[in-house]
């Protein structure tokens, strides 16, 4: 028996089990603190993990509900959460994902109250040689956002991609990707535009590159990003580079972040293949 994953919401677990049953794969649920999903036939593990990655992208897809009807489990007596939106948020996000989201929101509120400049004096990339040993500055620039749309866009992608990485590969992997991409994307961006920039987008682009390439080269990792979304990311970089939308974008951070994510995914997938 091989444990595939755990769900906080037992109804979500049952939906996945029902769907896999329609695909000819038998999974079982064991209730502990969470709903643990187990696979008896370990030879099917790769297929199940690939399907799990797709399921986590959109658990509300009609095909999963249809599978529950087909399996006869829609009236299973499981407890439905009162707030499915927040249950979905918790389902995908681990502690590191939440900590970064909360930190970004707190910094954003502080910027609205104190003003952008006041907060940037404390968190921006070192803008004076005397600040080069204030090491937090090499990372905290990623926590600053300058509009509601800016922070919503970045946090949505952070939750979607960072949560998947943390759930499947662990908090440590997400921390490493975040710190390395924040450092290197910040370094490149300050070479382009100076120290007065901010936002999580460099890290988000690193996660896009990492999740896409790792999923392509190592499907057993359980993470996956549709090719259409990585194409969208590339189009957005080109649009920002040529200023097609008249918006100020951290183009250097975007390119550097994407490169960092791709490089880390290549190395990790190479190591995964060597272990087989």
Curated annotation (Swiss-Prot):
The chain crosses the membrane at residues 94-114, 142-162, 169-189, 192-212, 229-249, 250-270. Keywords: Cell inner membrane, Cell membrane, Hydrolase, Membrane, Protease, Serine protease, Transmembrane, Transmembrane helix. The keyword Transmembrane applies. It catalyses: Cleaves type-1 transmembrane domains using a catalytic dyad composed of serine and histidine that are contributed by different transmembrane domains. One of its GO terms (biological process) is proteolysis. One of its GO terms (molecular function) is serine-type endopeptidase activity. It is found in: Cell inner membrane. It is a multi-pass membrane protein. One of its GO terms (cellular component) is plasma membrane. Its EC number is 3.4.21.105. The active site is at residues 201, 254. The keyword Chaperone does not apply. Belongs to the peptidase S54 family. Rhomboid-type serine protease that catalyzes intramembrane proteolysis. PANTHER family: RHOMBOID PROTEASE GLPG, RHOMBOID-RELATED PROTEIN. NCBIfam families: PRK10907.1 (NF008155), rhombo_GlpG (TIGR04239). This is Rhomboid protease GlpG.
